[in-house]
Amino acid sequence: MKQEKTVSPTVENNRSAESRLSQCDLDECFDESHDRDEEVLGSMTDAVYSLLKGVGEDPEREGLLLTPERVAKSLRFLTKGYRQDPEQLLKKAVFTESYDEMVLVKDIDIYSMCEHHMLPFFGKAHVAYIPDGKIVGLSKIPRVVEVFARRLQVQERLTQQIRDAIQNVLNPRGVAVVIEATHMCMVMRGVEKQNAVTTTSAMSGDFMTSQSTRSEFLRLIGNH
């Protein structure tokens, strides 16, 4: 009679961990356990409760009973980029390739929050690089944009961080990033200019030194 092999819980747990890590190799990977940290979520929930009282609301009324926890969970999601490593994400999909012309991913949706008022800003990012023996999986470029956007930001720094991450990992002949965004801190408050759009750029290598390369990039994103 054939005996069935039994697998210890430890082995099963190790296999589960390996499977999870393998999935992280394919997708964005971050410390999920940190998201489930009840102590952090609890302190954030208490803080939102105090804010509601501070603006003159009653956190105990029916419509607001679950609001503190909902807001805390939303903020954890909107700032998940702090718990992700964009350069490690890029390194998981780097390939040797002789292609040496511009690679452009444009019209990447971005949603972030300004660090001054914690109000949203949103728009489009356009990212290009010129390979020097290495390319990266195309989906990783929007993912890197997402990682940096899901933090408290200023648009200027966000633009530079995207450029620097790609430059550091691929060491290409050049990187170009342009972001066009609407800032709710300018729309809902302050100057209240509903149609104002902020454009920032960060470039390196050939995009800095070659006018024709820079012009090609701007033409391709429709900004010339």
Swiss-Prot record:
Q: Could you mention a single GO BP entry for this protein?
A: tetrahydrofolate biosynthetic process
Could you give one GO CC term from the UniProt record? cytoplasm
Catalysed conversion reaction: GTP + H2O = 7,8-dihydroneopterin 3'-triphosphate + formate + H(+)
The protein's organism comes out as Chlorobaculum tepidum (strain ATCC 49652 / DSM 12025 / NBRC 103806 / TLS)
Q: Where is this region: Disordered?
A: 1-20
Q: Which SUPFAM superfamilies match?
A: Tetrahydrobiopterin biosynthesis enzymes-like
Q: Which family does it belong to?
A: Belongs to the GTP cyclohydrolase I family.
Binding of Zn(2+) occurs at 114, 117, 185
Q: What class of enzyme is it?
A: hydrolase
Supply the alphabetized keyword list: GTP-binding, Hydrolase, Metal-binding, Nucleotide-binding, One-carbon metabolism, Zinc
What is this protein called in UniProt? GTP cyclohydrolase 1
Pathway it belongs to? Cofactor biosynthesis; 7,8-dihydroneopterin triphosphate biosynthesis; 7,8-dihydroneopterin triphosphate from GTP: step 1/1
Q: Which GO terms describe its molecular function?
A: GTP binding; GTP cyclohydrolase I activity; zinc ion binding
InterPro entries assigned: GTP-CH-I_C/QueF, GTP-CH-I_N, GTP_CycHdrlase_I, GTP_CycHdrlase_I_CS, GTP_CycHdrlase_I_dom
Q: Extract the PROSITE patterns matched here.
A: GTP_CYCLOHYDROL_1_1 (PS00859), GTP_CYCLOHYDROL_1_2 (PS00860)
From the UniProt record, report the name of the gene that encodes this protein. Answer: folE
Subunit-structure text:
Toroid-shaped homodecamer, composed of two pentamers of five dimers.
**Enzyme nomenclature, EC number:** 3.5.4.16
Gene3D superfamilies, per this entry? 1.10.286.10, 3.30.1130.10
